[in-house]
Regions:
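Catalytic domains of cell-wall/extracellular-matrix polysaccharide-remodeling enzymes
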Residues: 130-190
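A short alpha/beta connector and helix-capping loop motif
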Residues: 35-62
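Acidic (Asp/Glu)-rich catalytic clusters
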Residues: 42-48, 63-78, 94-105, 138-140, ...
């Protein structure tokens, strides 16, 4: 889960995202749809008023059910881009899984891999982002209005340099931490 303590940045556009109200505290739960257990625990938090929104993983084992629950209950969902955890939906297209596996192998190789641009993976990044956006639209009936990433990989060099996040969408930044919360190496990566 994240809170509004994490600053957000909006990708510039002519029309601002209306869903984000200034001064509103957003408590967001990540990994929505990753597994049945994660979805069920998140629903419990939502019903208690502990969270106000979710970041949805698509192409995962519980993505379909999670989307149905979110739509029926009016839960605000953004896209939780996933480049590092294997897609687990039984109907995940093989090419999408293959491109994601190439990306994951590179990004998980060493801790600084995400700050380096990988030109040989440019098409794989485009393909995997597009596939996740298309699946989000299919499941939720709308394009995502906000983005974040599993393991914060939505801020990796390929995503930023290739400008793969749509203009006008809210994007979670992960650069504000309390003193001593992160190691120097971790802060350097961010």
């Amino acid at each position: 889960m994240t809170s509004s303590n994490e600053s957000r940045v909006t990708v510039p556009s002519a029309a601002p995202v209306e869903a984000l109200n200034a001064g509103r505290l957003i408590i967001n739960a990540d990994d929505w749809g990753r597994s049945r257990e994660t979805t069920d625990r998140t629903i419990e938090c939502y019903e208690r008023g502990s969270i106000s929104s979710v970041s949805a993983m698509v192409l995962m084992e519980d993505s379909e059910r999670a989307a149905t629950l979110a739509c029926k209950r009016g839960i605000d969902a953004g896209l939780h881009l996933n480049f590092t955890t294997p897609f687990s939906a039984p109907d995940c297209p093989a090419p999408v899984a293959e491109h994601q596996q190439k990306i994951a192998k590179c990004l998980l190789r060493h801790r600084f891999a995400q700050v380096l641009f990988h030109p040989t993976l440019a098409r794989s990044f485009e393909y995997v982002v597009s596939a996740q956006e298309d699946e989000f639209r299919r499941l939720y009936g709308v394009a995502p209005q906000r983005y974040d990433g599993h393991h914060h990989m939505h801020l990796c060099a390929n995503i930023l340099i290739q400008c793969l996040l749509p203009r006008g969408t809210a994007v979670r930044r992960n650069f504000s931490f309390e003193a001593g919360e992160k190691s120097f190496a971790n802060l350097l990566v961010r």
